[in-house]
Each structure stands twice: as C-alpha cells, then as structure tokens.
C-alpha cells in the first residue's frame, strides 16, 4: 500500500475528502488513493479495523464497499474460510449496531447478499454453508422493530441480488444459482413475508411510528421481490411490460389457492396510507399475472372471481387513486385482467356487468383528464384493445356488454384529444403530438377498439371532422381570423387525421363488410379533400404536425387498400370514384406520388417530413404490381429524369445542415433505383442519362481533390451526399444486368476518389461511415448479382479495392490513440464494424478465388486479414459483446474465416489465437442468439480442423503437416484449458439452460468431446456425483446413451447420430433433474 495510506486516521480523512469535499482536485486525489488502498494486499485487515474502530459513517461505507469488491472478484478469489468469517462478522456487526447510518446498513447487507450468492454452491463437510439465510435472520426477526427491519431487508436484498445477473460472472452460473435458490429457499421467504404482513395488518399498525412505517415498507418490498423473481430465466428485458406471465412454480400452488393471500393485499390497500399503496398494487399485479396452468378451470374461475371482487372494491372507493403512483399501478392491474384471462372467463364472473361498467366509467374519466398521468393511459387502452379483439371469438352465452361500453371509450379518447388542443396552445403546455412514438402506440390500440361498433366510430369521426374542417375553411377565408383560432382547428384536424388513419389501419379482412369499406371511403374522401386545401396553401404557410398526420394516414391506407392482395371491387374505391373521381388504384397512386413530390418540394428542409415522405415512396416501390403502375405515371417519370437539387431541395448542399441529415437520400435513391429497374433492361443509354447528376457530382469532387487548396466543407458535403445516393442505387440494383452497369460506371473511374476520401477524413465518422457502407454494399453479392464473365478479372479487382480501403482505414484509425469511452463507438468501433461486415461480404461472396492471391504473389488478401487482426486486438473483449452491431459483424466474419481460411487462423501468434478463442468462449453465453449460434459454428470449424490435423499427425503419411497446422496443434496442446472450458460451457448450457439453439450447440460438442475424452469423463463423473444418490444411476445412464453408437470421427453421419442422441439426452436429463434442488458442485461447470 502507498506510504500516504498508513493509518486509520488517514483513511478516514480520505473518506471525508471523497464524500464531502466540493473541490474536484481533492476528491480525485482521494479517489486515486482509495483505489490503491482497495488493491493493496492488506485491504481485508484494514477494512475490519475501519469497521471496528472507524469514527465516521463514511469509513464504514468504504470498508463495506471494498469488502464487496474483494468477494466479487473472479481472479484470485478469497478462500472459503475467509468468506465464511466475513459473512459471520457482518451478521454480528449488524446485530450489535442497530443505529448505523442507513447507507452503511445497506452496504453491509449488500455485502452479505453478494457473499451468499457467489458462495451458493460452496460446501464444507457436505454442508452448503451459504444457504442458511432464513436461519441467519431469525434472531433479527425475533427482536425489536429496528432489528426486524434489518432482517427483512437482508432477505429482500438477497432475493434481489440472486435475481440479477451481473456481467462479471457467466450467465450459466447465474441461472444455476437462481434456479437452486428458487427451489430451496424462495417459497419459504415468500411465506414468511406474507405471515409477517398478516401479523402487521392485524395489529392496527401505528403508522406515525417511523420504525413501524419502515418495517411495513420493507415487508412489501420483500414480497414484491419474491413475486417479481425471474422463475424460469426469461426476463432479460426489464423495461418491457408485455411478457406479463409470472411463472410461479407448481410447489407454490397452495399459497394461491388460499384466497386469504389475495385478500391480504386488497385489505392492506384499504387500510394503509396511499404512500404505501403503490407497492401493494405492484404485488397484486404480479399475483394477477400468475401462469394460467397453475390452476385447473374451476380453481382459475374462483381465483378470478376474488380478483375481480377486489378490483370492484377499489373502483367503488377510488379516493386513493388520486395519487399518480397508485393510479399507474391500478391501471397495470386492470390490464392484467385481460392479458391473463379470457373474455369468456371474465363474463362468467358473478359481478362482471357491474365491474365492466365501473371499469368503463373509470376509463372514460381517465381519458377526459388527459393531463393526469398520461403514461398510464397505455394500460387502460391495452385492456380495451384486448377486450375488443376477443369479441369475435367469445363463445360464452353471458353478455359481454362491450357493444355498449367500447363506443364510450372510443368517444372519450377522440373528444378528449380534440378538447386538449385549445388548452395546450392557450397555456403553452407540452403537446402530446410532439411524441409521435407515444401517439402511434395509442393509435395502434385505438385502431382495434374503434373497429368495434365501427358505424358509431365513423359517425362520430365524420361529424367532428366536418365541424372542424368547416371552421378551418371559414377561418382561412376570413381576413380577421386570429392565428390562435387557426392553430386550434389545425391541431384538432391533426388528431382526426391520425385517428382516421388508425381506424382504417385496424381493418381486418376476414371481419370486414362492404358497409365498413364504404365508411372507410367516407373518411378517406374527407382527408384527401383536406389535403387539397392544405397543399394549396403551402406556398404561404404549412403545419408540420398536420403533414406528419397525413403521412401516417397515407401509410395506413397503403397497407390496407393498395397492393397485390386488395380486392379492387372494394366499396371504398366506389366511394372515392363518386366523390373525387378516383376510379382505380392507379389514380389513387397518382395522388400519393403528387403528395410525395409536393412534400419534397415544400418541406425539403424539414427532416421529419422528408424522411417519412421518402419512406412512403420506398414502401410503394416494393410492391410488385404497384411499382409497375407507378412507373407509368408522368410524375414518376419526372422524378426519374429530374432528381436534382433544383427540383428537390433536400438533395442540395446546405452548409447549415448536419452531414447526418443526408441519410434520407439513400431511401430516395433506393426507391428511384427500383422504379428505374422496371423498364431498364440492358438500356445503357437510359442508365447513363439517369446517372448524369451523380456523374457531375463525382467530377466536381475529383476536380476539388486535384487542387491543393479546396473548400473542405463543400467537398465533404458533396461526397457524403453522393455516396449515400449511390448506396441507395446499389441496394436497389439486385439483378446482374443493372448491377454490372453500376459497377462499370464506378470502377475504375471513381474508386480512387472514395479511397482518397478515406485517406483524408479517416478521423471524421460523418464522412467515413457513408463511404465504408457504400463499399460494403458494392461487395455484397445480393441475389447473386456479382457474377462476372469467365474472362473478367473484375472479382479480383473489386477485392483489391476492398482490401485497399480496409487497410487504409484500419491503419489510420489505429493512429487516433486513446478515445473517450463515451465516443469510442462513434469515432472508432462503428467504422471497424462496417469494415468487418465488408470483409465478410467479400470473403463469402463466391466471386473471388482466394487461392490465386498467394499463387501470384498478390498481398491484397493478406493485407486485409492482417488489418482485421490489428483492428481486433485494439478492441477490449467486453466491447465485442457490449455493442450489438459490432458483435454481429465480428462473429459473422469469424465464422467465414474459420470455415474457409483456417490456415490463416492457424498461422497467427499464440496470443492472437487465445484472444479469438476467448471471444468465442464468451460469445457462447451471449444473450443474442445470432452471436451464440455464430460462435458455435466458429468453434465447430476450429474443432474439426484440430481433429483432422491431429488424425493426420498420428498417421504415417508421406506429406508432413504444414508449418501453420503443426504450430496450431502445439499451441492448443499447450493450452488445453481453453477448449476444455468451452466443452464445459456448451454442456452446461445444454443441460441446465433454456437452450434455444440446441442443434447449433450440438455440432461442436462431439469434436470437443473427442479432443478431450479424459476431461469429458471427469466432467461427467462430477455431474453424476453432484446429483442426489437416488438420481445418480439415471444420470449415469443418460451419459451412456449420449455416446451410444458414436464412433471416433467427425463424419456427417456420425455427427447427425450424435445430434439425435443429444436431443434425447437433454430430455432425459431434464426429466431426471426435475424436483432436484442439488447443484453441480464443480468449479469447471460453474466457471
């Protein structure tokens, strides 16, 4: 330890500086010194001294957090005896010092929880020494309220700690601990918590007493943590509320069949202050979400009846719901009524008619008070959406009454949104229309609700639309109209256009009638008439939100009524013909294109409208029949012949805008490329005519690059716009004929300009990203479009350019030096990721024979591969998995390299090989299934290569192993632990996890076993011996059957036999391990 950290007094002073000082320099120096202290050899003993003799709470906090780090480290872990001593010391410390600062108590409880979790499978004299949590806290629970709070908090924190995976330990180990804790301890903790809550609620708690206040809060947190436990390892995304089934184990059935458990929480809700109620309701949300299969039909009906009664009681006494947190949780509870139970079950509940009336009134009132808890509306709309969607399927004879209440909900939503417009504008409030994501989510829900009793929805929309449209027209014609009045009507019309688009988008083909299609026609006519009015005023004024609503409407209309699947006899088209003279789909498409051109002309500098407009054009260009109709329109021919900034301002070089604003150009040119291809065929003149603006742009950049001094900003903007345009065209040209025209146009004339741009601006991702993405698209053999003639060297020439760009970018980006963590992806890793994708596309495109490079002394392949290695070694392992796009590009490239270029992998330095193998090992447990599957494939190729080389080396052959293979074998023999670790990981996942890619996992496993037969035998014995005595024979038999009929080779027939055996093995092991609470006491299995 450093000299200046010698005494406790000095340590305490450093803690004070760290937590109290306002001077940044002093705090940083204290932090640095304390980091040294944490890493020092005598940290453990000093921590104990700080806890024993420290005079400040900060020094106690430091000691607790340092000890937590010490027990959590994976390298050089503390011995078992020492960890037992720390656990016992912490419990005694908490038991003898009830008056510690809250944050110190919390830190010590966290330390206890961490030790317990990480030592869950540690044994001493056949005793799992860290599994006595309930015994550990009993003495706290039998003491005063202060001690009782500590005991409950320990259980709560432990449950939470075991439920959460951490990045420093493998996910397989986490799931193993969580499963064992669930089976051995969690139900006892839940039962204890409920019993303590019953005792507390029966005692008429004195909630003015701060300590009793705290006890109730901790008990509710503990109960919620138990119910919120990830029982089967599926809750990887905690932000999602959609997967709302709680997978309660069958052994918990008794607690939920007993109605007093449910009743306890409803009673608590009514008897405690509103500040505690949100936690009670959170528990009820989880209880309402228990899996359906926990009950039989009669039990479920009884449980649902109690649940509905409890909800009814809350709705009849809604005073506490004025608290936003209570209201939010109660809305979540209502949503679970339909997500977990069927409408046919709900209508059979005795009080259903009264409850559905109360829920409808509550929903209508909530929607009318739109400014109160807007984030909770999602749950209410979710309930009604699910109810409405169930109406066609309900078979129960009891009335569901939704035909009465659903229109009320629809009306409340529509009228409340319209009424909000004036208040928001008058008071300068935040406009919900600004949050298009939230609006879209609500409209998706309303689309189903509104189609229930659709004639009522349409009548309301027609009435409201006509009123607003008439008022709007009158205001526009009036010279004295105030801007405020115009803005109000535009806001109302914006909501109505969004809602009309939504209800049209909610049309379901099998449930729609001619009358409903005619109603859709009425609504569409009105929106198109409004569009004609607003478009005629665009030269003077426009409303961005209304335009975005129009685009949303067009998108919904396109999905339902335009395309190959739509019946052209639809009553909607008849109505459009009568009112607007639009007789068929081609005429409607001309309206679409007219609107698209108008938007691009008048809104070219408004990014949201431009990008949505271009997305609409792009979607139209995908349909087989619609794209052929579009090409015949004069407006589309105008676009194909005049795609310049003169006609479309967003294509201009605007020095005020950001370079990233040009992204939409790719979408534009993808659509134009598809439209051009319809009639292009082999017409090179038409192609060259189309490319004239891009040719001029390339020539302009070439001219700038040829001079020593040029306007860098102008050059950057011209080039970035150009490469984004080209990428759109390259993506659209997925046929050989058209793509060859593009290739011959760009190579060799313009390729040097792209290389020069990378050379000049490698440090500016706004320039390099579009250039690299264009190159990655050009080398992508999409739809086999890169098929060169047998006499053409173009495949090799294209790869040379690819290699040159990767090498140039890679060597220069590595000169950036240290990049701040928050900028490392944008400045470095994103470009590297695209290079990996580019190299993968080139290597797997099947248009280059890579054997010729070495044969003719061409270093293009070697340069690209060596640059890949340099770039890879500059990336920490953690980053490879932390950034999803980088993960996918790296592992898919590695898959190609291990499949086709194993000789290159074998020739690498030992530390590089170990780096690659480590990355595969870590990727095997990745949450992303694509990454995990890719790693299995890489591992399979490596193991197969190793096995073949090993087989050859043992045979008497005239041709010896080449130098690379020999060295690779030697490295792997020196470091068997890496392959053994992966064998252990794969086996662990197959046996103990919810393995979603079992076939992929099975492919490398046979090779791993054949390469490590002794290790596999030890591992098998370890797993068998870890089972309860009565299950060991069954487990042994499972392993015997796994290798039944398997030969010592990796021929396809043998592999397939093994894969079949493995499927049976997994089923048998799962059956054998059911009801077993024992874990695998093996360091290899757990690491």
Swiss-Prot record:
UniProt-recorded Gene Ontology molecular function terms: nuclear export signal receptor activity; small GTPase binding
This protein's GO CC annotations: cytoplasm; nuclear pore
Chief localization: cytoplasm
Subcellular location: Cytoplasm; Nucleus; Nucleus, Nuclear pore complex
InterPro entries: ARM-like, ARM-type_fold, Importin-beta_N, XPO4/7-like
Residues where N-acetylalanine is found: 2
Modified residue annotations for Phosphoserine: 570
SMART domains assigned: IBN_N
Swiss-Prot/TrEMBL keywords: Acetylation, Cytoplasm, mRNA transport, Nuclear pore complex, Nucleus, Phosphoprotein, Protein transport, Translocation, Transport
Domain of life, source organism: Eukaryota
Cysteines paired by S-S bonds: none
Keyword Phosphoprotein: yes
Family annotation (Gene3D superfamilies): Leucine-rich Repeat Variant
Pfam families: IBN_N
One GO biological process term: protein export from nucleus
Protein family (similarity comment): Belongs to the exportin family.
Role of this protein: Mediates the nuclear export of proteins (cargos) with broad substrate specificity. In the nucleus binds cooperatively to its cargo and to the GTPase Ran in its active GTP-bound form. Docking of this trimeric complex to the nuclear pore complex (NPC) is mediated through binding to nucleoporins. Upon transit of a nuclear export complex into the cytoplasm, disassembling of the complex and hydrolysis of Ran-GTP to Ran-GDP (induced by RANBP1 and RANGAP1, respectively) cause release of the cargo from the export receptor.
Subunit record text: Binds to nucleoporins. Found in a complex with XPO7, EIF4A1, ARHGAP1, VPS26A, VPS29, VPS35 and SFN. Interacts with ARHGAP1 and SFN. Interacts with Ran and cargo proteins in a GTP-dependent manner.
Stored PANTHER family: EXPORTIN 4,7-RELATED, EXPORTIN-7
The protein's name in its UniProt record: Exportin-7
Organism (species): Pongo abelii
């Amino acid at each position: 330890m450093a000299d200046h950290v010698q005494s406790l007094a000095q340590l305490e002073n450093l803690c004070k500086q760290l937590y109290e000082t306002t001077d940044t320099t002093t705090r940083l120096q204290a932090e640095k010194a304390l980091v040294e202290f944490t890493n020092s050899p005598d940290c453990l003993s000093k921590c104990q001294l700080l806890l024993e003799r420290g005079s400040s709470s900060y020094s106690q906090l430091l000691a607790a957090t340092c000890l937590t780090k010490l027990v959590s480290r994976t390298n050089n872990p503390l011995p078992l005896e020492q960890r037992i001593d720390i656990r016992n010391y912490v419990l005694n410390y908490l038991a003898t010092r009830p008056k510690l600062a809250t944050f110190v108590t919390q830190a010590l409880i966290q330390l206890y929880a961490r030790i317990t979790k990480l030592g869950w499978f540690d044994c001493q004299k056949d005793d799992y020494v860290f599994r006595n949590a309930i015994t550990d806290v009993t003495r706290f629970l039998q003491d005063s309220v202060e001690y009782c709070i500590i005991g409950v908090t320990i259980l709560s924190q432990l449950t939470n700690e075991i439920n959460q995976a951490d990045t420093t330990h493998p996910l397989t180990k986490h799931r193993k601990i969580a499963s064992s804790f669930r089976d051995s301890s969690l139900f006892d903790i839940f039962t204890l918590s409920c019993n303590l809550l019953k005792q507390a609620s029966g005692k008429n708690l004195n909630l003015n007493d701060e300590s009793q206040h705290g006890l109730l809060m901790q008990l509710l947190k503990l109960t919620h943590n138990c119910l919120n436990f990830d029982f089967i390892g599926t809750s990887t995304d905690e932000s999602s509320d959609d997967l709302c089934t709680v997978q309660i184990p069958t052994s918990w059935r008794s607690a939920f069949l007993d109605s007093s458990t449910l009743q306890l929480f409803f009673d608590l809700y009514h008897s405690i202050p509103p500040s505690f109620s949100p936690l009670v309701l959170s528990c009820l949300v989880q209880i309402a979400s228990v899996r359906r299969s926990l009950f039989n039909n009669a039990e479920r009906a009884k449980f649902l009846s109690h649940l509905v009664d409890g909800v009814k009681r809350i709705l009849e006494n809604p005073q506490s719901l004025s608290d936003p947190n209570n209201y939010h949780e109660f809305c979540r509870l209502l949503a679970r009524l339909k997500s977990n139970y069927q409408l046919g079950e709900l209508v059979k509940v005795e009080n259903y008619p009264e409850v559905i009336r109360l829920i409808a009134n509550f929903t209508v009132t909530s929607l009318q008070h739109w400014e109160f808890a807007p984030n909770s509306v999602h749950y209410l709309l979710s309930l009604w959406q699910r109810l409405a969607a169930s109406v066609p399927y309900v078979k129960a004879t009891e009335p569901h009454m939704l035909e009465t209440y659903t229109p009320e909900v629809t009306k409340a939503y529509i009228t409340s949104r319209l009424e909000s417009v004036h208040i928001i504008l008058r008071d300068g409030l935040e406009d919900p229309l600004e949050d298009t994501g939230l609006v879209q989510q609500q409209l998706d829900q309303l689309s189903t609700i509104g189609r229930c009793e659709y004639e009522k929805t349409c009548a309301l929309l027609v009435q409201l639309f006509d009123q607003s449209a008439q008022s709007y027209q009158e205001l526009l014609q009036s010279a004295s109209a105030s801007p405020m009045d115009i803005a109000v009507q535009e806001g109302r019309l914006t909501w109505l256009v969004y809602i009309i688009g939504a209800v049209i988008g909610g049309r379901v083909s099998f449930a729609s009638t001619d009358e409903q299609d005619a109603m859709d026609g009425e609504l569409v006519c009105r929106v198109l008439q409004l569009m004609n009015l607003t478009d005629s005023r665009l030269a003077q004024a426009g409303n961005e939100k209304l335009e975005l609503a129009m685009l949303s409407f067009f998108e919904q209309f396109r999905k339902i009524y335009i395309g190959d699947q739509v019946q052209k006899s639809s009553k909607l088209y008849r109505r459009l013909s009568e009112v607007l003279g639009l007789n068929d789909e081609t005429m409607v498409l001309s309206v679409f294109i007219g609107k698209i051109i108008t938007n691009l002309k008048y809104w070219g500098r408004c990014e949201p409208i431009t990008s949505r407009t271009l997305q609409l054009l792009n979607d139209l260009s995908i349909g087989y029949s619609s794209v052929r109709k579009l090409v015949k329109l004069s407006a589309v021919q105008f676009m194909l012949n005049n795609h310049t900034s003169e006609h479309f301002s967003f294509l201009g070089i605007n020095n005020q805008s950001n370079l990233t604003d040009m992204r939409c150009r790719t979408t534009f040119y993808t659509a134009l490329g598809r439209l051009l291809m319809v009639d292009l065929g082999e017409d090179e003149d038409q192609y060259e005519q189309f490319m004239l603006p891009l040719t001029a742009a390339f020539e302009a950049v070439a001219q700038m690059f040829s001079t020593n001094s040029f306007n860098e900003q102008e050059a950057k903007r011209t080039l970035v716009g150009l490469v984004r345009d080209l990428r759109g065209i390259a993506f659209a040209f997925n046929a050989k004929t058209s793509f060859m025209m593009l290739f011959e146009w760009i190579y060799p004339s313009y390729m040097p300009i792209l290389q020069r741009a990378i050379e000049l601006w490698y440090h500016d991702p706004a320039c390099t990203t579009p250039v690299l993405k264009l190159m990655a698209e050009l080398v992508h053999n999409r739809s086999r479009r890169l098929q060169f003639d047998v006499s053409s060297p173009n495949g090799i020439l294209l790869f040379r350019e690819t290699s040159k760009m990767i090498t140039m970018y890679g060597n220069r980006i590595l000169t950036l030096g240290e990049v701040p963590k928050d900028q490392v992806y944008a400045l470095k890793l994103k470009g590297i990721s695209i290079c990996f994708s580019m190299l993968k596309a080139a290597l797997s495109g099947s248009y280059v024979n890579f054997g010729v490079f070495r044969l003719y002394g061409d270093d293009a392949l070697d340069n690209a591969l060596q640059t890949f290695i340099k770039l890879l070694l500059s990336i920490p392992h953690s980053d490879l998995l932390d950034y999803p796009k980088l993960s996918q590009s790296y592992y898919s490239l590695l898959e190609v390299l291990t499949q086709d270029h194993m000789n290159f992998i074998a020739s690498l330095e030992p530390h590089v090989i170990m780096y690659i193998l480590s990355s595969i090992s870590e990727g095997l447990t990745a949450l992303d299934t694509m990454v995990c599957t890719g790693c299995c494939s890489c591992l399979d190729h490596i193991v197969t290569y190793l096995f073949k080389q090993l087989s050859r080396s043992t045979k008497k052959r005239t041709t010896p192993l080449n130098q690379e293979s020999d060295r690779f074998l030697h490295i792997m023999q020196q470091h068997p632990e890496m392959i053994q670790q992966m064998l252990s990981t794969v086996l662990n996942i197959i046996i103990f996890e919810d393995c979603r890619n079992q076939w992929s996992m099975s492919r490398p496993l046979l090779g791993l076993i054949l390469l490590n037969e002794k290790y596999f035998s030890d591992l098998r014995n370890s797993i068998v011996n870890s089972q309860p005595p009565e299950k060991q024979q069954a487990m042994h038999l499972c392993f015997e059957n796994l290798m039944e009929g398997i030969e010592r080779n990796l021929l396809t027939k043998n592999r397939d036999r093994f894969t079949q055996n493995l499927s049976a093995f997994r089923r048998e092991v799962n059956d054998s391990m059911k009801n077993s609470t024992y874990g695998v006491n093996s360091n290899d299995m757990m690491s």
